[in-house]
């Protein structure tokens, strides 16, 4: 994704919402 809000802990996913247990919600 272009401009992620933050990254998840272990998998470095693009997150635009919450990070729960190392994946995006």
Swiss-Prot record:
The presence of a 'disulfide through disulfide knot' structurally defines this protein as a knottin. The cysteine framework is VI/VII (C-C-CC-C-C). The modification 4-hydroxyproline is found at residue 4. Disulfide bonds join 1-15, 8-19, 14-24. The keyword Disulfide bond applies. It is found in: Secreted. This is Gamma-conotoxin PiVIIA. Keywords: Calcium channel impairing toxin, Disulfide bond, Gamma-carboxyglutamic acid, Hydroxylation, Ion channel impairing toxin, Knottin, Neurotoxin, Secreted, Toxin. Expressed by the venom duct. GO terms for cellular component: extracellular region. Its main location: secreted. GO terms for molecular function: calcium channel regulator activity; toxin activity. The keyword Disulfide bond applies. Negative results: does not modify sodium, potassium and acid sensing ionic channel (ASIC) currents. Micromolar concentrations of PiVIIA increase the magnitude of the macroscopic calcium current in DRG neurons from rat. An increase, even modest of the calcium current, may have a significant impact in the excitability and electrical activity of neurons, and may set up PiVIIA as a member of the pharmacological family of the gamma-conotoxins. Belongs to the conotoxin O2 superfamily. The modification 4-carboxyglutamate is found at residues 13, 20.
């Amino acid at each position: 994704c272009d401009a992620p809000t933050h990254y998840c802990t272990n998998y470095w996913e693009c997150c635009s919402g919450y990070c729960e247990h190392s994946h995006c919600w």
